[in-house]
Amino acid sequence: MELKIDTHSHTYASGHAYSTLIENARSAKENGLAMFCTTDHAESMPGAPHYWFFANQRVLPRFLEGVAILRGVEANILNTEGEIDLPLSVDPNLDWAIASFHEPVFAPSNKEAHTQALLNVIQGGRIDALGHLGNPHFDFDFHAVLHCAKDHNVAIEINNSTLKGHSRVGSVERCYEIARVGKALGVYFTTGSDAHFCQDVGKLDLASELLDSVGIDSHRVITHSPSQFLDFLELRGRGPIDELASLRQ
């Protein structure tokens, strides 16, 4: 499946990534993307940037190296109440918010606790996608969470980095099963490289392979085309981004 948007990438501001936003944009162009989301870790992750880093993203240009930039964050799920580590005042300055579990922030617990946290973060209405759900340390009720995501128009991320099998070991088959459940329920899918170095931005080959293998319809993959992605943002209640209107053509 052709994928024109990468919705998960990091700069050196995350504390354990190694490239600048401009370097990421250059790689995005080289790898054939139309747009990408910059999604550094929110502040609870060790080494992550502070409040003003996210609040000030309005100064970022809408295009770098001819590639559209979406202003975003990878927020941490903090607890079973589904709270995230991002002040509400930041939300108007961002286009895209992922919520993810990370061991340094949310200690792995049990299936029921993880499920409750995911249901609550979806129902909270502040996040657009759930990141790298395949991690076996954070087992959850696939059907309950994906059904909730479908009802609230929250996308399910297919994470290319996870599918390499080097991080979040044990995730690959779980990612395929999550995709199968999501297909049956009719969820929206997004795709992210989870790049921590610029050369990986736009590397979505394994995500594309999974989507094709499971038989996901491209109309349910919001990263298949810029127009689909922008339509999804508006479905989520975000206002139109006038500077990106030309990408709908």
UniProtKB/Swiss-Prot annotation:
<feature type="binding site">
    <location>
        <position position="10"/>
    </location>
    <ligand>
        <name>Zn(2+) 1</name>
    </ligand>
</feature>
<feature type="binding site">
    <location>
        <position position="41"/>
    </location>
    <ligand>
        <name>Zn(2+) 2</name>
    </ligand>
</feature>
<dbReference type="InterPro" id="IPR004013">
    <property type="entry name" value="PHP_dom"/>
</dbReference>
<dbReference type="InterPro" id="IPR003141">
    <property type="entry name" value="Pol/His_phosphatase_N"/>
</dbReference>
<feature type="binding site">
    <location>
        <position position="74"/>
    </location>
    <ligand>
        <name>Zn(2+) 1</name>
    </ligand>
</feature>
<dbReference type="GO" id="GO:0005829">
    <property type="term" value="C:cytosol"/>
</dbReference>
<protein>
    <recommendedName>
        <fullName>Probable phosphatase VV2_1469</fullName>
        <ecNumber>3.1.3.-</ecNumber>
    </recommendedName>
</protein>
<keyword id="KW-0479">Metal-binding</keyword>
<feature type="binding site">
    <location>
        <position position="194"/>
    </location>
    <ligand>
        <name>Zn(2+) 1</name>
    </ligand>
</feature>
<feature type="binding site">
    <location>
        <position position="102"/>
    </location>
    <ligand>
        <name>Zn(2+) 3</name>
    </ligand>
</feature>
<dbReference type="GO" id="GO:0008270">
    <property type="term" value="F:zinc ion binding"/>
</dbReference>
<feature type="binding site">
    <location>
        <position position="16"/>
    </location>
    <ligand>
        <name>Zn(2+) 2</name>
    </ligand>
</feature>
<keyword id="KW-0378">Hydrolase</keyword>
<keyword id="KW-0862">Zinc</keyword>
<dbReference type="GO" id="GO:0071978">
    <property type="term" value="P:bacterial-type flagellum-dependent swarming motility"/>
</dbReference>
<dbReference type="Pfam" id="PF02811">
    <property type="entry name" value="PHP"/>
</dbReference>
<feature type="binding site">
    <location>
        <position position="196"/>
    </location>
    <ligand>
        <name>Zn(2+) 2</name>
    </ligand>
</feature>
<dbReference type="InterPro" id="IPR023710">
    <property type="entry name" value="Phosphatase_YcdX_put"/>
</dbReference>
<dbReference type="InterPro" id="IPR050243">
    <property type="entry name" value="PHP_phosphatase"/>
</dbReference>
<comment type="similarity">
    <text>Belongs to the PHP family.</text>
</comment>
<dbReference type="InterPro" id="IPR016195">
    <property type="entry name" value="Pol/histidinol_Pase-like"/>
</dbReference>
<feature type="binding site">
    <location>
        <position position="74"/>
    </location>
    <ligand>
        <name>Zn(2+) 3</name>
    </ligand>
</feature>
<feature type="binding site">
    <location>
        <position position="8"/>
    </location>
    <ligand>
        <name>Zn(2+) 1</name>
    </ligand>
</feature>
<dbReference type="GO" id="GO:0016791">
    <property type="term" value="F:phosphatase activity"/>
</dbReference>
<feature type="binding site">
    <location>
        <position position="132"/>
    </location>
    <ligand>
        <name>Zn(2+) 3</name>
    </ligand>
</feature>
